[in-house]
Swiss-Prot record:
Gene from which this protein is expressed: aaeB
Membrane-spanning ranges: 11-31, 41-61, 65-87, 91-110, 125-145, 150-170, 369-389, 406-426, 430-450, 458-478, 481-501
Alphabetically ordered keywords of this record: Cell inner membrane, Cell membrane, Membrane, Transmembrane, Transmembrane helix, Transport
Membrane topology: Multi-pass membrane protein
Assigned GO CC terms: plasma membrane
Localization terms from the record: Cell inner membrane
Protein name: p-hydroxybenzoic acid efflux pump subunit AaeB
Lineage, highest ranks first: Bacteria, Pseudomonadati, Pseudomonadota, Gammaproteobacteria, Enterobacterales
Amino acid sequence: MLYPRAIRLRFACKLTLASVLSLLLGFYFGLPMPRWSALTAALVAAAPAFAAGGEPFSGAIRYRGWLRIIGTVLGSLCALLLMMLLIRAPLLMILLCCLWAGVCTWLSSLVRMENSYALGLSGYTALIIVVSCLGEPQFILQLALERCGEIVLGIVCAVLVDTLLAPRSVKGEVDRVVGGMLLGQLRLLQCCVDGRDGDAIDRSWHRLIRESHTLEEMRASLALESSRWPRACRRLTALHTLSLTLITRACEIFLTQCQTPMALPAPFLALIAAPVDTPEEAYQRLKQLRRLLVAHGEHQLPPALIGWIGGASRLQLLVKGVASNVRIGRYEAATLAHDTAPRPLYSVQGHHALINGLRTWLATSLGALFWLWSGWSAGSGCMIMIAVVTSLAVRTPNPRMAAIDFLMGSLVALPVGALYYTLILPATQQSLVLLCLSLGALTFICGMAVQKRRLGSMGTLASTLNILALSNPMGFPIERFVDSAIGQMVGCLLALVVLLVVHDRSRARTGRALMRHLAFGAVAALRREGTRGNLLPALYRQLLLLLTLFPDDIGRYRLALTLIVLQQRLAHSALPCDAGRLRAIDAAATRLLSGGGSARCSGALLQLTTELGDYADCLARQGIASAVLQPLHQLADVLYRYRSVLLD
């Protein structure tokens, strides 16, 4: 087993070799700007390492590479289209490129974080190509093809080096997380049954939620890592939903215990409360719970406990299948077929995304107008850096710190780049080996710093490689270096100023939208089984976003968790279908979800609670048991009591 320092050294070597190999192949194939291939190889490998705080998994590097290829091709096509249509109106063409960058940033803020890189990249790629060909528009197609070729070459080198030199498979980490999943679920159940330590419940719940979503992210990396894992990926998809279901069941048992302390029989309480320390003990405890359930019978037991034991049994079966990756058997296939495909919900960050797009469009447009008005020689580089920083920084959890990272990197790149540009690179023109060694040393040092998430490390690597004249043939005019370095620094500074000046005050609006989506998900459980879909993963993703936006708001978190529990109880309840009333309930929930004005939302919420109450009264007149109707009454009561959280 390698020590952490050895792992960091291994990744730094792989990063260095990938950058040097892409540079050598760029010179060998006669590409005009081999620095783009070297920069691509460095960024594709270093960005996941910076995000992970260590050596990334092989699947993450390949996924990042595919996103970069898609974004580059999309941006190149947009640049070609704009150049063909507006070649006689350069000002309008550049402003439309700025608008395209803003639209791409807006769209990237609406998709999932791991997919947003392609859209953000396509925005500033179009701007780079158009600005580079502004003086010679007849070479636009050649430049677009060359840039795509250099990008693909850098990605191929990064993936090839990672594959050949000790690739880090995510399968071992998946097995570790999956192996301890049943133990974590059982400990959460123990905390919920005990119910005395609320902080322990919150910690255990939060850890399991994070593990479940981390497992879903690792599943995407595993799918790209090798063609050997399709069965494991299918099982992991079902495990993700099943883990969230067990968490919800445990929280439902906690609420049941709070309302009815004697709901669980004494034998179950004693068996659940007994300590467990290892996954093997958790497996044996699950077998004992199953035997006790068979001996006791399902009468006078909470449905949540019965569902938890059944779900834990299915989870243990899938865990064994993930570890062995054997062929899916008949019983396991039935378990997987029972799992409904997750159904996504619309993004609740529409206002936040609009502000992000506005920031990029405004910053790049002002930079373009100032460049064209002043004729500043470094204006093009400044405008491109504004687009790059605003497109990428706004999708990070802390955009201000991301912009500071770029600014620090551009400041450090000035003396480092000057040393390379004026002394080292001119002295290595007669020896390709010395050139590779000098650039490899720079990449190696940055690779070590990136894994430790040093402030400015990513920006230093990207900015230094960008300002060096790694072209074919190479030249070293000092004016070009000064323009490029100053343009980078001013662009990063202006991007930071825009992020600070254009405030994002969408936090409260996003919080209300999240609560409305959770309420809509709870009401959607009343739909017919074939139309409701599996909303549980989407609801928990929104709950995590709510915790990110309001980390100290325990009341809002409790309300959101209650809505998710009610959604599961309604989804598994045996309520008869009244098509007319369900359509009215669904229409009111849709009106509440769509928002509008305060009066419109208030009216929709009032109509929704009224319809839910009428539906419950109608079912009561039909002789439906009060225990079956309890979740329906609870949902109507929760929506009415907490209406101020859902409304403006």
